[in-house]
């Protein structure tokens, strides 16, 4: 409905250009918003106020001219001017009912699909050789929810798990394995089963022994030179580390697979060419022995240019080098229209610089969109980054296990007579969903406080509340036998039916925001509002005890659409639904 009103306004603006009311080359981003007050209609635009300056007319006069020029539409019951020149649209109830009717048998719930694009999504991307920790949660689940929404809307999505599988940490691990094998022979392999402790011990040796650190750096050079022994061990480290990652992904219900892994090492062969190409274009400068690029747009507080370091004085490459190689690959090989990077907000300057440089060096097509969709940090209840009681990093697997234990206690307290197998399965879904939803429901760019107590509450905008809301709606159909809604028609008579219908009709608009802005929190807010709208409808409008069959079937269709929308919305967030709780 919103896109329909936008189309009417676009046609009106085109007519204004033809009549000379506004300049022919005038470009306006027409904004149509949902109204908060029903007395102001369903949708509103400030187009008249946007045109005031170029048209040389006062906004209320322009608003009336817009209304007079609008093409006729069966969807619009009436149009009014409000305040200084807002235009309010009242949607025809029968048109809304028709829109909902079309959604009933449509797998996309009546959503008009956009023109499909190829979208590369870079997310999760942990450094290997260590277990995943809570710092990896946000990129992993925010990226995955946006991927799901993109695919649902018909886009071709290419997941890229740009793991940190190269660099100094591997020299450290190789040197430590070398020491262990010198002492214990092949038995040293067993110590790799606990990768985290193995890494910690190697790091301790690296920090304490200059001789060990020198050997570690030497092994990095040997690894990069293709030494067979070093490469064999490196592959073992990676395989063990990736196995840990995919155990976590499976538990989180994240859609990444081994086939999506395209880490730093995948671009090793391209890095030298990146340097040569930048040099050939005259973009490289030498600074303290390193090869760097300075761009006029990037300066520090003192006004000094900020470098993008491409190659260190010792010949080593940096993140910027592999990122540039990856961008070129994603543009030229993957043919991406958009590339989305779900990486911590603290990397904002890095991405601004490399995006700018990639365009400047023509490593990427001009029409390819590079987007850093950064996020804030997950903090403990003290407001500081989330840590263990001893101050260490919290392993993601430990966090999920605690969520499961707490969810099991909660579910058992509410269902003392339920069998253990059912309790365990419900707790698994509730625990994981609570952790994911608590994160996804927060604005991506904000920091947030992690609280098990809040996220496991059955009140407010939480996963348990929404999971229960879904079971409540779906439960209506368990009380109906021989249900046949094939001939049923949606009719919106009661005010609460209209409110629910209006909310259901917004699903497509919400998903557009999720994929355009990378903002799953707007979907969470929508699902919470939808659950509330259904609750108000259910209290005011008897469904199974409706006045007649036509009314009952209409309300059953509204309930069915609500259940499907809640389920689809939660699934797009990567959250399973339950049939009972």
Swiss-Prot record:
Gene Ontology MF terms: arginine-tRNA ligase activity; ATP binding
The UniProt entry's GO CC annotations, sorted and at most eight, read:
cytoplasm
Motif 'HIGH' region location, chain numbering: 126-136
Task: Spell out the Pfam families in the cross-references.
Answer: Arg_tRNA_synt_N, DALR_1, tRNA-synt_1d
- UniProt keyword list: Aminoacyl-tRNA synthetase, ATP-binding, Cytoplasm, Ligase, Nucleotide-binding, Protein biosynthesis
Protein name, per record? Arginine--tRNA ligase
Q: Which family does the record claim for this protein? A: Belongs to the class-I aminoacyl-tRNA synthetase family.
